[in-house]
């Protein structure tokens, strides 16, 4: 839709201006192609999501080139490319195998986690449970917003004030769901203080502060 080229044109103007002034400009394009909309469209059309996703990427690429935007296509990325998502999997595994040391205020390898003596005496199952309770990435029950119409989990930002789903307009409900969680609050203060040194518009930084929040 028209909103895409509007934003792309603005960054392309800056990229072209910087190039003409002798800067080495990194101006790639990529596709955030994983997601529930892609899955749902594949279900509705009876087509494998890889087929529909690749077709959409090809269409976007063709349209962007027709607009004459100066992206570096040698650096094109696609989140469904194994060469790309292997690194997101690698990051998740790193989080899973890390615990947060409050004394040093940083993450450490899970193999360095001190195990209390009473836990050791309780046996292997208790030891595993204790270790899992300290991982930065852990599996737990949590309340989520669920849209019965779309059959998907909704982010808080997708739920309107009247309790409806912004995408379909139908009511959402609260459900308990087993899911992966991250201990982001442990890093909240560091993330918040890091915003102060960024040369970003204050409105964007305030938005980030609201997203990060603080551990209470």
Region spans (language model):
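N-terminal, positively charged nucleic-acid-binding surface of large information/translation enzymes
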Residues: 2-216
């Amino acid at each position: 839709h028209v909103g895409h080229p509007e934003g792309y044109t603005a960054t392309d103007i800056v990229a072209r201006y910087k190039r003409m002034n002798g800067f080495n400009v990194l101006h790639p394009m990529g596709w955030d192609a994983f997601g529930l909309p892609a899955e749902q469209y594949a279900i509705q059309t009876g087509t494998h999501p890889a087929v529909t996703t690749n077709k959409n990427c090809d269409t976007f690429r063709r349209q962007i080139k027709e607009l004459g935007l100066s992206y570096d296509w040698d650096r094109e990325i696609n989140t469904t490319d194994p060469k790309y998502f292997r690194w997101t999997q690698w990051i998740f595994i790193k989080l899973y195998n890390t615990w947060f040391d409050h004394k040093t205020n940083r993450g450490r390898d899970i193999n360095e986690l001190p195990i209390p003596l009473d836990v050791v005496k309780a046996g292997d199952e208790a030891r595993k449970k204790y270790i899992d309770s300290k991982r930065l990435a852990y599996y737990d029950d949590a309340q989520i917003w669920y849209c019965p119409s779309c059959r998907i989990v909704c982010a808080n930002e997708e739920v309107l004030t009247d309790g409806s789903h912004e995408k379909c307009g139908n009511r959402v409900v609260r459900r308990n769901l087993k899911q992966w969680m991250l201990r982001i609050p442990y890093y909240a203060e560091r993330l918040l203080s890091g915003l102060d040194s960024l040369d970003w518009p204050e409105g964007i930084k305030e938005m980030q502060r609201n997203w990060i929040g603080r551990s209470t």
